[in-house]
Amino acid sequence: MAGLPNSSNALQQWHHLFEAEGTKRSPQAQQHLQQLLRTGLPTRKHENWKYTPLEGLTNSQFVSIAGEISPQQRDALALTLDAVRLVFVDGRYVSALSDATEGSGYEVSINDDRQGVPDAIQAEVFLHLTESLAQSVTHIAVKRGQRPAKPLLLMHITQGVAGEEVNTAHYRHHLDLAEGAEATVIEHFVSFNDARHFTGARFTINVAANAHLQHIKLAFENPVSHHFAHNDLLLADDATAFSHSFLLGGAVLRHNTSTQLNGENSTLRINSLAMPVKNEVCDTRTWLEHNKGFCNSRQLHKTIVSDKGRAVFNGLINVAQHAIKTDGQMTNNNLLMGKLAEVDTKPQLEIYADDVKCSHGATVGRIDDEQMFYLRSRGINQQDAQQMIIYAFAAELTEALRDEGLKQQVLARIGQRLPGGAR
């Protein structure tokens, strides 16, 4: 792959950050580093990177600095939620800021052992970067038949540094949900300050037979941050997984969700809401493999694009040859709020089996004039009318959040990104 003009400089810096950790890194992390160096960074000429600008990131001077945060500072950034909370600061687990997990139903160990984690479903260069620079793996297990009373909240706090340097932090987690288990896991990403930083995130999840997963991702970082994430879900027979991502902050945010349905009668829901404002770019990508028959999947991805923002959606459903009775649907709906706002959408199907029911679709539009006229004629001012329409557009996604307090906090974040909000 042809690299960016400054690709070599960025790769050299990342290599140096890896070597600064000495010889304690796992063989798997070393292999990912070698793959990163062999692959190089993509350019706009590469189809999958055509709309994701990298120049503002790769010409940076990277550092890896672990800051200290007090409980009061953590609380100022935290969600108000009754959950078992694990806190990570600048890529590192901080036990003093985290809850004890004994008796919670979650077994947690943190080390650099990667023997039991699955291979990537769809590997690419920034996945290799996070796998190589993440200093440890958070191993989470929920035993057979267990149903923890509280959600597990993974809170990630990344700080920028003064000057031209960019602090880089990489987070690596793995969850094993055993047979018949049920759990809710929330990823929460925030910025400690207003300075630039670069976050890499990788989360792999095994959902065993008859297990049920509720996964929520909240990307609430600052408007000059870069965030590249790769989540993999693997489902066995009769497993269920619901994944909801709210991508609400970042100069460049690229979120990948890759899934394999490896058992019959599994059920999958993948939803996302992205709201790029000003000059932000939000790139949402899904890759779904229906590898066994009698499975059901639904995807709903929505974007609300303001100012000069750009939203990108690229999704693919692949139905294997023997995956009969597959029922898969993927929908991407986009609402443009500015004359210079842009959307690029590419939903795709690859079907190699007979007797399946699959569909995909995409819509791009602006606020309906008749809707606006109806609201204005009832004495509602233009800004309030716009906000009502936007909240209604997002409601199909926000209403899927079971916890009312969490839903209200997501709605508040949406409100900050609306015209007139504090962005």
Where are these regions (language model features)?
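Short, low-to-moderate order helix/coil transition modules at the start of elongated helical scaffolds
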Residues: 1-202, 210-212
